[in-house]
Amino acid sequence: MEVTTDKNQPSRKSPIDTAVVLLMIGATLLIVWLSFSNRTFWGAHWPGYGDMVSLLPEPSAWLRWVLGDISEVAFYKHEFASIGLLAGAYLAYWANRTGKSWQGFAISYGTGLWPWLVTSSLLGLLLSNLLWGWTVTATTWQPTFVAFVSLPAAMVLMFGGGWKVTINGALMGAVFVTPMCLLIVNYVCQPLALPAVIGNVLGMAIASVLAFLFCRYWPNLVKSSSSQTPPASIAPAKAPDYGVIWSLRRILADFSEAPFFGNELASLGLILGALLAYSLNPSSPAYGSGLLLHIIGAQALASAIGVLIWRQQWMLRGWYPTYIPLVSVVPAAILAYGGSWQIIVSSALLGA
């Protein structure tokens, strides 16, 4: 995997470009196949969430489950949202690499490590489902998505790119993070009737701390003999003015912050994919709850309140975790208590 930022070689194709084109073709073929293979099981324009889990462990259902894991951190759990997220993220990476003015916030914080980051996250997700997918049944949800939004990406950002960090991060995500979340969700959250998101967040935090301690004592897991310097962005970003336009962009970027993308184009792809899924079948995204629009609205409100309240922290630190309510208390509250305006407003306020 080679990342280049050389503006003098516009005609040279990166392996990333070829891989993304192949992935997009594969995703299109997958959608066509799923459409025809599931036609006898659904009456709407796309099979619902219940149709998917009822067909487990059939291959078509497993493909939908694994793809849905990519967007599950936002509680959308749908293949269209996941494909939209990845497509938007790649567009943002390409725009950053070629110095486009419309790139938005530099993806993955301007490190240039997005190809390694997303590769490690996807490998960790695949390994997690291979190792722990047997725990998922038609009636039992399990947090197989957690490796995509935790340790693998964090290790790439911490230790840099390269296959050693990418593969070891993916392995640790599948071996440390996913089982820790499974234990806490099934043996703590469920007996105490607590939301699963508590177990997910706690499990990711504990496992990540253990993994980083592991790397401290065995540094060869993440250090290469020839150090790789991550490629920089084409040009340094101008200092933001933290005005209205910046705030609107920040609200949108918060939707893709959890997988360490933090970019408006990635967020736009995520949301548009989820809305497409909802338009085809309201019972398909968001676990078939029909509450996708309520969740998106509440997430936007929570981010807006957070950006407004914590604007000074953004100005002082350059980054602040205003995205956290979007992937925790806000969607969890709506799924648990419904989509009334009281729940939307109160969860957004308390979350922010």
Model-derived regions, located:
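Residue-level signal for well-ordered alpha-helical segments
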Residues: 104, 108, 144, 149, ...
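Membrane-helix interface "capping/anchor" motifs
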Residues: 112-113, 133-140, 156-170, 308-321, ...
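Membrane-interface helix-loop-helix junctions at boundaries between adjacent transmembrane segments
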Residues: 8-21, 155-237, 247-257, 352
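Membrane-helix boundary/interface segments in integral membrane proteins
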Residues: 127-128, 147-159, 327-337
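N-terminal signal-anchor module of multipass membrane proteins
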Residues: 2-134, 241-313
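Alpha-helical transmembrane segments of multi-pass membrane proteins, especially transporters
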Residues: 113-121, 125, 142-148, 165-174, ...
